[in-house]
Amino acid sequence: MRLIAGPCQHESLVHSHNIAKTLTDLCNELGVEFYYKASFDKANRTSLSGKRGVGFHDTLLDFRAIKESIPDLKILTDVHEIWHINNIAVDFDDAVDVIQIPAFLCRQTDLIKAACDTNKIVNIKKGQFLAPWDVAGILSKTENAKEVWITERGTSFGYNTLVNDFTGVQYMLDNYPNVDVVFDATHSVQKPGGNGTSSGGNRAYVPTLARAAAAVGVSNFFMETHPEPDGAPSDGPNMVALDDMRSIIQQLLDIEKVIK
């Protein structure tokens, strides 16, 4: 099993290091492959008042320091513009292992091709507006990629609501055998714009959806987590408390044993 986990946005060196170390130790104990995730800039905000993050340069410097402190740690971060990708490739090649394309940018051809021209794994979030079979069009743009992941993060279902279609997840598992299908259990419970000037969500449903994905055969999971989710600068309502991660991971491992 693979886990991609961390806070919504990078807040500080100490904050990210502590989360990454906690999750590294937990995953090593449970035999789970781990990638730490955090964003340097939350460019897609519900309103102008939304907190965006520490910024590209300072965050990437912190990523480098965290990787130096935690042996073999792998880090994923999302990009929004081609210059982000170019700067990672030139100046911060050692700080990032996976480049993520956000869901709302999943059809941006030049952005995808630029990410795939690096020697990085590319994780593409499947847009909330996209059918599972339409992912084939995205994958046609990734021929130069070292490795590609596709992440399911829910489908728009009316105003401020997302749902998960697990037949669609099964479709991607069956029809894209050369791609790792990832299930994002925390953004799947998001209510986009549901709190007026910010997005809402309900983290209580995260374990349920993650278990359902595991039962379908997913073995790659994306979850945002935070020591104090309700005090997080973004996506707090759908982030899992760090102390609850062990229980969720163990449940997924138990299901994986049963279906195999």
Stretch-by-stretch model annotation:
Residues 3-13, 34-56, 225-235:
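Glycine-rich, proline-tolerant flexible connector loops at the mouths of alpha/beta enzymes
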Residues 118-225:
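Catalytic alpha/beta core domains of metabolic enzymes, predominantly
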Residues 22-30, 51-76, 115-121, 169-181, ...:
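Alpha-helix-loop-beta-strand connector modules within alpha/beta enzyme cores
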Residues 54-55, 70-85, 96-110, 120-132, ...:
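Catalytic beta/alpha-barrel core
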Residues 10-25, 54-61, 200-208:
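Glycine-rich anion/phosphate-binding loops
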Residues 48-57, 75, 100-105, 159-166, ...:
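Active-site-adjacent loop and "lid" segments of alpha/beta metabolic enzymes
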Residues 16-20, 85-104, 109-117, 192-227:
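A short alpha/beta connector and helix-capping loop motif
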Residues 32-39, 74-79, 183-185, 219-228:
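Short beta-strand segments at enzyme active-site cores
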